[in-house]
């Protein structure tokens, strides 16, 4: 039985890479997490357990967090029930992204630290994401794939906002987004496009960068997103509201959010 499951996973993961490579591009959307959501939260909602944490030089492990330091088990159960109730409402277009129905083959569950690590290594072993350019559509394909094959509720995939390396906000997910240099010739070359279709360009990215997935095993030991950019976690960071806004403003993220709201 184990061999059968392994063979099925191997085939399906190989299909994932091909579907990601074939995915048509879309304008870069803010699937990286809306910074205004974090910055607008009241400090009164701050978890007391986080108030004593320092965000400098700390390492995190699965004993400290379920996955991220603000997961609420009751809320997660509600999400799980909601997903089960609304599974039939998923768009047909989403079905096409993975080439099959997105009805999960296993019971639905939330992403955990251990599960994120297991899925990261499994996808790496099958060559799933390495070097593939990030796009909103590919983000969605990965969500649907793990929902269908592993029953993982697609609320886990989120990255820091950039510029530069975008670190996963889900502790245990070992794939970060790294800006790569793509020459004009490579972007215009038909063969390169077919082999590595850069479905997101520097014109789609708010920072003018072309991010690609890269495996980083050290993310299993250090919660880089939280250590480097605590302000992106809003009131959950332990920072004062003023400090959160100051840091977001210094990085140009609040201005970016304001421009989006006025469009």
UniProtKB/Swiss-Prot annotation:
It is found in: Host cell membrane. It comes from Simian immunodeficiency virus (isolate 1A11) (SIV-mac). One of its GO terms (molecular function) is GTP binding. The keyword Manganese does not apply. Pfam families: F-protein. Residues 140-156 are annotated as: Mediates dimerization. The N-terminal domain is composed of the N-myristoyl glycine and of a cluster of positively charged amino acids. It is required for inner plasma membrane targeting of Nef. Keywords: Host cell membrane, Host membrane, Host-virus interaction, Lipoprotein, Membrane, Myristate, Viral immunoevasion, Virulence. Belongs to the lentivirus primate group Nef protein family. One of its GO terms (cellular component) is host cell plasma membrane. It is a lipid-anchor. This is Protein Nef. This is a macaque isolate. It comes from the Viruses. Residues 88-96 are annotated as: Acidic. A lipid is attached at residue 2 (N-myristoyl glycine). InterPro entries: HIV-1_Nef_core_sf, HIV_Nef. Seems to play a role in optimizing the host cell environment for viral replication without causing cell death by apoptosis. Enhances virus infectivity and pathogenicity. Probably involved in viral immune evasion mechanisms. In infected CD4(+) T-lymphocytes, down-regulates cell surface expression of CD4, CD28, CD3, and MHC-I or MHC-II molecules. Homodimer. Interacts with host CD247/TCRZ; this interaction induces down-regulation of cell surface TCR/CD3 complexes.
